[in-house]
Amino acid sequence: MNTQETDFGDEIIQDDLPVHTIPPRYIFLPWHRVKKEFIRRTQWNDLTARMIKRYWLQQLKQPEEEWSLDESIDAAVSVVVSADIALDRTLKCLVIPGEDLLDIRALWRDVNELNCHIRYLGFNESFGSSQKGTRVHVANNAVLSLPRVYPDSCVVPDRFESIQSRDSQAFSYLKQYGPYHVVNLDLCGSMFPNTVKDTSEYYTALNQLLIYQFANQRCEWLLFITTMVEPTVIDADRMHALCKPTRENVKENGDFAKKLKTFLPNEAFRNVEASINLKNFSKDQLIQLFGVALGKWLLALCQAAQPQWTIAMRKSFKYSINEEKGAVMLSLAFALNPNITPPVDETGMAKLELAAKKYPTESECALKLAESVFQIRDVDETLAADAELKSKLRDSHADLLEAAGYDRAAYIKWVEEGEKTTND
């Protein structure tokens, strides 16, 4: 073969081969801090693994998998995605990933032993996985090469908020890849009512998401919402609007009102018909109020749906992102369950023995929500009190970042020197 032919052939091969690696990175950003690994491992992935084991395992069970032929005793196990993998038996995830897809990499790491296939749709405002030359493209290629990752998983260059329009490209993708077992909304912005930026797009998009999920999902699913909360810029009027379901519960549910008084100022809801009295709220109490209000807003939507849905807050956390401004990230987790009841024959004509299925009432859900908000844990305090845990998380995060093209030793040094960024 002549040189011209060789070059021509090389070009074809290079175009077809996915790019997996780029030069190592040495600059680390706020979301590379150990506390983010805590959230991934302790909240997102632990809760997902629990749901797989308890509820989803059978529905995610695939036909017998094909194993690669080059395995040896010492070789890493690899799985070839078979052509007969059932699409409706994949763990379907909706995410808002960064350019390195660290959340998806971590999810795969922590649930791969459960032998389920992951299929994901990601929204990234800057770049999509089909755009060659971007880190998102490289990262997506690397993730797709992992065992049990469905090959059409992708990241599209769009905002999650765009799904609020049913005519948008984003909503079209939402339908194509759903319904979802896991929705992880790791937001760059804030759902906390504030005077800096309007939050209505987030609420509209989340409402649209729930409409879609309620119409198409028939099993329990997880919703993670990570949002910035900055009490110093609270929009009192918008907070009052968000708290409408909360105020109604205070008026109608004595147990709920009593529970709120254990961690919020007593005079806050003294006149539920008027605006909430925010005068004596501390910053921590405003964060708790927002947690309750957002949870009650979601619960109201669940109760308005037909059939209704039960929602429960799972273990949730907060951590500081700007001590001077009192800003924190609130990482909330919710499990949503459809209230589907089988038809029971009360005449005795049918011989099936079916007990009427009972679900928690709205009042019971509201009370448990208030209790869960009160139990939100501070990640900074947890890590400060447990050096061994922080060390383990640092090392596991270093492994994750190294797989994504970062220099491991540089990351360890960065953590040991206080995790400072250019904005500090």
Show where each model-derived region lies.
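SAM cofactor-binding core of SAM-dependent methyltransferases
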Residues: G9-F171, G348, T361-A387
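Conserved beta-strand signature within the Rossmann-like core of class I S-adenosyl-L-methionine
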Residues: A215-P231
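C-terminal target-recognition/interaction regions appended to catalytic cores
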Residues: T3, F8, I340-D424
